Amino acid sequence: MTTKKLYFLSISIIILVAISIAIYITLNSNTKTRLTNDSQQQIDTIIEHDLQKGHIPGASILIVKNGKVFLNKGYGYQDVDKKVKASPTTKYEIASNTKAFTGLAILKLAQEGRLNLNDAVSKHVPHFKMNYNGQNETITIKQLLAQTSGIPSDITSEDSVTSKNNRLNDVTHAIMGDELHHKPGEEFEYSNMNYDLLGLIIQNVTKQSYTKYITNSWLKPLHMTHTSFKQTNYKSKHDAIGYELQGSTPVVSKPEFNLWDTPSAYMMTSTEDLEHWIKFQLNPPDKYKSLVQQSHKNLSSTIGEPNANAYASGWFTNNDEHLVFHSGTLDNFSSFILLNPKQNYGIVVLANLNSEYVPKLVEHLNTQIVNHKRYSTVASMLNQYKDQFNIVTVLMTTLILLAFIFSAYRAWQMRHGQILLRRSKRIAVLSWLSLCICIALALILYALPYLILGSNNWSFVLTWLPIEIKLALITTLIALFSTLIVILLFLHTKITKT
């Protein structure tokens, strides 16, 4: 067989391999699908994969779509030592997801005429004063909501908090007269202190404690009867134990905390209770519709914040994808709430570990929900073609073995002087062309999740793909580059005449 024929035969094999994989993955009928047991299994697989990767002891996860609960389930343990499993009733510290309650309460008080968003903070918090470049500056309630007050994110230290000043009323004493990072209203800077001050304003305007007002005005009407606010490190029956990682091992953690951070960080709740909150946010009663919509409106631009265009009243927003969301992190807990009012669904992940895998999990679940019809159809189709993928795996494995045998034989021939290297411009061009074709096909393979499923994340796709498809993909990729090696050996070597 001539070199030219061998070259085109090898290229044909590569193209046919790539096309066969593309055909198997892209076969997609017009059959309408809905969320089925297979979809539930896919979601469970995604969740368990991310929790395992993040070494998260326990989590409770809620998905609400079109006013109905699709998923409300616990995974792992709320208490590892006692083997108490996480459940929808497990209570977690939700950290900064407390801010949305505080923001909504402020907007409600403004709607009732009990305060104005353009009021100076000092109007409701007597003697409040902060400086910029040595000059006293006026900060408004709206600037606190928008995180544009200029108050630094690191303005207080845990070391400065004692049992004597660890109350919401003491928050102003900790920062009184301190220097702002920038002039109020000019720049976004995320700071818990903004929402702590809003909590104090709520307290002063309503003449009742912040926690009592939130409970009576929002929690009870929404039937969030098991939601509370952290007061001590004592854990009741349904409270999750918080953990921190030591290496890859979660260990019990009970960090110190500030009571004055209650309005910004220390609500304790469950997915069972948050079901009511999510439904309220997505489909509020008529009397609250304008209020909820206002709480989702952009107040400030958040340049530099990942995946966010702006900050609203206790929420980040992404206008491009119509998302309203917020993460919450403490030393030993993390949470993430995502809303898509346009498509009418919400996702909640509560975990008893501070982990970067919590927002990753929400991203994966969001992708799954947005594309669930496509995923369900593709997954169903792939399951029907498992035998064919097994055949592909066998063929690709055979091709890899043949390529290995040929390469080893060529190496043996070279060692014994039976092979000579040849060089020419034509061979160089063909070599570069072969390499470019292989790279192009590899890039197409890499882009398949985005082209077919709307996700550019292979790690996400691989969590729910059947093992037969995974093996077919892996062996195909190896076969692709094995074939390239064979092509290059054909082009650059020739058998010596004896």
From Swiss-Prot:
Highest rank taxon of the organism: Bacteria
Of the GO CC terms on this record, one is:
plasma membrane
- Main localization of the protein? membrane
Q: How does it sit in the membrane?
A: Multi-pass membrane protein
Which Pfam families is this protein grouped with?
Beta-lactamase
This protein's UniProt keywords: Cell membrane, Membrane, Transmembrane, Transmembrane helix
Spell out the InterPro entries in the cross-references. Bact_CellWall_Synth/Modif, Beta-lactam-related, Beta-lactam/transpept-like
Write out the annotated subcellular location: Cell membrane
Which intervals of the chain form a coiled coil? none
Bilayer-crossing residues are: 6-26, 389-409, 433-453, 471-491
As a miscellaneous remark, the entry gives:
Has two of three conserved motifs typically found in penicillin-binding proteins (PBPs) and beta-lactamases, but no penicillin-binding activity has been detected.
PANTHER family, alphabetized: D-ALANYL-D-ALANINE-CARBOXYPEPTIDASE/ENDOPEPTIDASE AMPH (PTHR46825), PENICILLIN-BINDING PROTEIN 4 (PTHR46825:SF11)
Say what the protein does: Its precise function is unknown. Has no penicillin-binding activity and is not involved in methicillin resistance.
Q: What is this protein called?
A: Protein flp
